[in-house]
């Protein structure tokens, strides 16, 4: 069964292609795509998608479906970073054009960061928090619902939505259940688990230093995201990915509850690969 090979190619500041060739520099951000014609967004996404496909990428960790305003009504971190497609009415046609362009190039899309990154700080370094009410959070979720049939993967946020729980969304079974309600077949993907803020949260400390992360904490991190309801785990440290796979295999063999979760996750991922044409039976 072929692998899902992913990259986050949003455009603007999040532009991985520019590391390959200078021709990909200065690609429009989501904020800039807001004022582009829908067919122009489609053609741009198709062009980028063709490049991704050429390099063996079949999953783009984009587009961003996060709101432009934070929980206080001010520009959010995502908006300030030019990564938001804007409010619902503006965002829908642009996001749809982006996703269709990628699909035409045989590249799947990912909606992120569920249930909507509406904080004003960067959660990569320290867990960001949102004080949005449940009603506002549910309003932000509407954009994810809009694309339930078009975007097969949802990435969970690392933000703490304190009106719902004190736990970061990616660790929170209640919030993953909200994502699951959108579609039982949607594949739920974590944010980067090697991120400093998520590792520090698991360890119960303010900071973690370098790569010397305690094994017991790393195992706790894996168990937490699995039982929270996530299907795919993203980690930007290849050696730890190997360690993670080995530990998941051990958990599945030893404990029925972990085996069930692993089988559920694997079934969703295999279904996605089959329906998208990534895996074709002979």
Regions found by a protein language model. Give the residues of each.
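Divalent metal-coordination and catalytic microenvironments
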Residues: 8, 52, 154, 191, ...
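Short glycine/serine-rich loop/turn segments
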Residues: 60-85, 109-129
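Glycine-rich, aromatic-flanked loop segments that form ligand/cofactor-binding clefts
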Residues: 1-25, 45-69, 91-116
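Second-shell residues forming the walls of enzyme active-site clefts
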Residues: 93-257
């Amino acid at each position: 069964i072929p692998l899902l090979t992913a990259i986050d190619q949003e455009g603007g500041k999040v532009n991985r292609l520019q590391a390959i060739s200078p021709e990909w520099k200065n690609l429009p951000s989501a904020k800039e795509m807001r004022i582009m014609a829908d067919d122009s967004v489609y053609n741009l996404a198709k062009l980028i998608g063709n490049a991704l496909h050429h390099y063996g990428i079949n999953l783009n960790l984009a587009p961003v479906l996060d709101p432009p305003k934070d929980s206080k009504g001010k520009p959010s971190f995502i908006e300030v970073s030019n990564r938001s497609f804007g409010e619902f009415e503006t965002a829908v046609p642009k996001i749809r054009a982006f996703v269709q362009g990628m699909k035409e190039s045989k590249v799947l899309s990912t909606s992120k960061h569920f249930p909507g990154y509406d904080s004003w700080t960067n959660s990569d370094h320290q867990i960001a928090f949102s004080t949005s009410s449940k009603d506002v959070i549910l309003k932000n979720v509407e954009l994810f619902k809009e694309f339930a049939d078009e975007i097969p993967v949802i990435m969970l946020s690392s933000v703490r939505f304190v009106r719902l729980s004190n736990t970061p969304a990616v660790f929170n079974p209640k919030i993953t259940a909200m994502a699951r309600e959108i579609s039982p077949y949607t594949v739920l993907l974590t944010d980067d688990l090697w991120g400093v803020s998520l590792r520090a949260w698991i360890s119960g400390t303010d900071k973690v230093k370098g790569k010397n992360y305690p094994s017991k904490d790393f195992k706790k991190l894996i168990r937490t995201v699995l039982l929270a309801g996530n299907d795919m785990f993203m980690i930007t440290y290849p050696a730890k990915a190997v360690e993670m796979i080995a530990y998941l295999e051990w958990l599945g063999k030893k404990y029925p509850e972990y085996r069930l979760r692993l089988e559920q996750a694997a079934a969703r991922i295999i279904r996605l690969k089959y329906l998208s044409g990534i895996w074709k039976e002979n």
